[in-house]
């Protein structure tokens, strides 16, 4: 959602939507999450949000800070095609990881236990967040997703995710 003041909507705004047929037969939603499931993250956090914030504020954090915006369909499709019983998938956009996990936990009626040390945040993102007083776990990503699935399938799912460039940094975070 993009909200702009009246008369301030100069420039180009692009909106997209997808229409398709679900052929996998899985119920992929927070209501499918079960106690003991693994939480997989497709890569490092916060690059998109910090890139946008730094550009808007005219700040520079070195050469490497760039958006993580990327298409996720190949990575997700690889896991689904392999027959892994994915319980929930969510993109890590508005509100970052914490908002996404809170939504899943609340909808599922469960709590989520994370290993914070396993959550990847690049040093330049961590530094930018520190300078601006932000928590990198609450910063938006545009090319990252969470997959919640049975623990016995986590290694296979990680292998498939890591085989796709966009999710080469996939890891188990909880």
Residue ranges and their predicted role:
Residues 1-174:
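Helix-biased detector of long, well-ordered alpha-helical tracts
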């Amino acid at each position: 959602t993009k909200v702009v003041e009246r008369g301030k909507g100069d420039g180009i705004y692009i909106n997209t939507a997808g229409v398709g047929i679900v052929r996998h037969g899985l119920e992929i939603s927070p209501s499918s999450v079960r106690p003991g499931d693994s939480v997989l993250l497709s890569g490092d956090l916060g690059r998109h949000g910090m890139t946008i914030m730094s550009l808007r504020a005219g700040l520079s954090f070195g050469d490497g800070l760039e958006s993580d915006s990327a298409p996720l369909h190949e990575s997700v499709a690889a896991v689904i095609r392999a027959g892994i019983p994915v319980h929930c998938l969510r993109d890590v956009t508005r509100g970052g990881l914490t908002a996404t996990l809170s939504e899943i936990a609340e909808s599922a009626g469960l709590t989520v236990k994370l290993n914070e040390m396993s959550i990847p945040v690049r040093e330049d993102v961590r530094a930018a967040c520190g300078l601006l007083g932000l928590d990198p776990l609450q910063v938006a990503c545009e090319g990252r997703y969470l997959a919640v699935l049975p623990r016995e399938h986590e290694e296979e799912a990680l292998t498939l995710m890591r085989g796709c460039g966009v999710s080469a940094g996939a890891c188990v975070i909880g």
